[in-house]
Amino acid sequence: MRDVALPCDGEVVGAVQRSAADSPHGDVVVCAAGTLPGELHKLWRTSAPGGYHVEYGYSCMGYEIAGGIGVKMARPDREIVVMVGDGSYLMMNSEIATSLMLGVKLTIVVLDNRGFGCIHRLQQACGGAPFNNLLADCLQGPDGPPAIDFAAHARSLGAQAENVKTIPELEAALARARASKRTYVVCIETDPRRTIDEGGWWWEVAVPEVSARPEVRAARAKYEEARRKQRP
C-alpha cells in the first residue's frame, strides 16, 4: 500500500520544468497522445523557438520516442524530453534501442496510470460505465492484470532507467537523466482519475441522446446546456 497520493500528469510536467533552471530555453518537449498534450498546452513554458513539439494532428500513440529521435537529430544542442504514457509506450518503444544505436540521447519520462487514463475519464464524463480502458477494468486471467516494470524493460533495450514514486524523487532522477550521455528513462505512477482544471474552455465530446443509463442522460443534459452557451 502506498503512503502517498499518486501525482497527476500536470504535477509531473511541473517537475520536469523545475529540474533544470534553463528548461524554458534549453528543453524541447515531445509528446503526442493521451492526457499529456492538454496538460502541456496549459503548463509548458518555452522561451525559444521549437521548444514545444506535440503531434496534435491525429494524436498518434507511439509517435513520441521516434519523434524524439528526429527532434534530437535536428537540434542536437537542445535537451530533448519525451513525455509518454504507458499506453503509448507499449505501442512503440523499440526506438529506445534505435536511439542508442545512433548515439542520440533522449530523456524519456513514462507516466504509468495503468491504462488509457484519458479515454477512461472521457468515458466516465459521458456517463459510461468503466470498460476496457484501465487494466483493472479489462478481462483478466487468473493472475490478474500485468505488473509491467517499464524501467526494467527500458534497461533491456540498453537505456539507463529507474522507477520513482514521488515528485521529489522524480526531480532527483531527472537531474541524473540530464547529466547522462545516453538515453535515460524515468518511470512514475500517476493517478488515472485526477487531472488539473480544463483551462477555462469546454471540450465538446458528444454524448448519446438516448440511453437506459441515468448517468448518460445526466451527461447529455450537461452537454446540451454547454452547447447553448457556445457562440452562434
Task: Indicate where each model-derived feature is located.
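Cofactor-pocket helix-loop regions in the catalytic cores of large enzyme subunits
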Residues: 1-49, 55-57, 93
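Thiamine diphosphate
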Residues: 38-39, 43-232
